[in-house]
A protein has these predicted regions:
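Cytochrome P450
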Residues: 1-401
Length: 401
């Protein structure tokens, strides 16, 4: 029998202390989230991997979305899943998931993503060229955001002029906005993507990634318009949010650990491998996306009944002391392979190779040009985004040098 725990209102500002407490009590706890949603929160590494792959668990929001209302203390504040966006592979189980992922995976193999490196380097260099020693800037605004949004917009064939709209829509969709704000943002993005998908479908096929996806034909099977819109939404939001927050969180971690920053300045060849440690320590995603139990599930001796929302804390699993020694310490020389920052199993992040490449390029060029950058605000004044899903800062003020 578990005790229902109410998570504090400032949970997203300091989740690690909460996770440490919960993890010490057991692998999974029944909790009320700050906005009143009752979930079973998984905080241990081994049980997180089980929960992410268990056949007793489903990701189908069409069939399980009603649980968000059933388990909320304030059903009126529960955001509705935008129907246009629900049909992406993140919200489906096999065989529907298998079909959609097969069409997308081909474009995101490590080999194909590596072909993007020269263009990513070019975009990063252009952004850095616009910055100067002595500047005080929000690093997210001038660098961490424009780099990945430019890359993903080019892959999807979307004019870069729309990037500020996407940032605003994404913020509304991923943060604790009101249902009305979320619905308005979802409607605006859906309308834009419908127009974009229709235009590409009516145009002659070309060699761009999204055109290939629109016109892809697997043994007579093609994505329909709604599937393409939902897929574009997933790629657009996940394709930039992950890298924005990975860069921002990593820079903050380095500025708070100058000895580790010095190691990377002295040995920049360690940056690619250190990516895994940054993902482990302060990954860009707090919890895995929506899951619920179709059947009762045993997690480390705790039974989660059927019909419950299962929330897997990726950041908690990655700081489990049973899996990683000194888990709260940044160690850029650590072998952090096996972390679950990108998920685990069939829903492992398809864009992981692209996020890793963008991070490698961004950190290499940033530290080469501004090796002595410093934080331009007291760490305790920094505010994390008001989102259970995303782990990222509102702003990251730095002084370039």
């Amino acid at each position: 029998m578990t005790t229902l725990t109410q998570l504090p209102d400032d949970y997203v500002q300091n989740p690690h202390a909460v996770h440490d407490m919960l993890r010490a009590e057991g692998p999974v706890q029944e909790v009320h989230m700050p906005r009143g949603l009752k979930v079973w929160l998984v905080t241990r590494y081994d049980e997180a991997k089980i929960a992410l792959t268990a056949p007793e668990v489903s990701k189908n929001v069409v069939e399980g979305g009603h649980l968000m209302i059933a388990h909320s203390t304030d059903p009126g504040q529960v955001r509705k899943f935008e129907p246009t966006f629900s049909g992406n592979m993140l919200n489906l189980d096999p065989p529907d998931h298998t079909r959609l992922r097969k069409l997308v995976t081909k474009a995101f193999t490590a080999r194909r993503v590596e072909l993007l490196r020269p263009r990513v380097q070019e975009i990063s260099a252009e952004l850095i060229a616009g910055l100067n020693d002595g500047d005080e800037v929000d690093l997210l605004d001038v660098f961490a955001f424009p780099l990945p949004i430019t890359v993903i917009c080019e892959l999807l064939g979307i004019p870069i002029d729309n990037r500020d709209d996407f940032r605003e829509w994404s913020n509304q969709l991923l943060s604790f906005g009101t249902p009305e704000q979320v619905q308005a943002a979802a409607g605006s993005m859906a309308a834009f993507l419908h127009q974009h998908v229709t235009a590409i479908a009516e145009a002659e096929p070309n060699d761009t990634f999204f055109s290939a996806l629109v016109h892809a034909d697997e043994s007579g099977d093609r994505l329909n318009t709604e599937e393409l819109i939902s897929m574009a939404f997933l790629l657009l939001v996940a394709g930039h949010e992950t890298t924005v927050n990975l860069i921002g969180n990593a820079v903050l971690s380095l500025l708070q650990n100058p000895d580790q920053l010095q190691i990377l300045k002295d040995r920049p060849e360690l940056i690619p491998a250190s990516t895994e440690e940054f993902l482990r320590l302060e990954g860009p995603v707090n919890v895995a996306t929506f899951r619920y139990t179709k059947e009762a599930l045993d997690l480390g001796g705790v039974t989660v009944p059927a019909g419950e929302i299962l929330m897997v804390s990726l950041v908690a699993a990655n700081r489990d002391p049973e899996r990683y020694e000194n888990p709260d310490q940044l160690d850029v020389t650590r072998s952090a392979q096996g972390h679950v920052a990108f998920g685990h199993g069939i829903h492992f992040c398809v864009g992981a190779p692209l996020a890793r490449l963008e991070f490698d390029v961004a950190m290499t060029q940033l530290l080469a040009r501004f090796p002595n950058l410093t934080l331009a605000a007291e760490p305790e004044t920094l505010v994390w985004r008001d989102s259970t899903l995303i782990r990222g800062l509102h702003t990251l003020p730095v002084r370039l040098a």
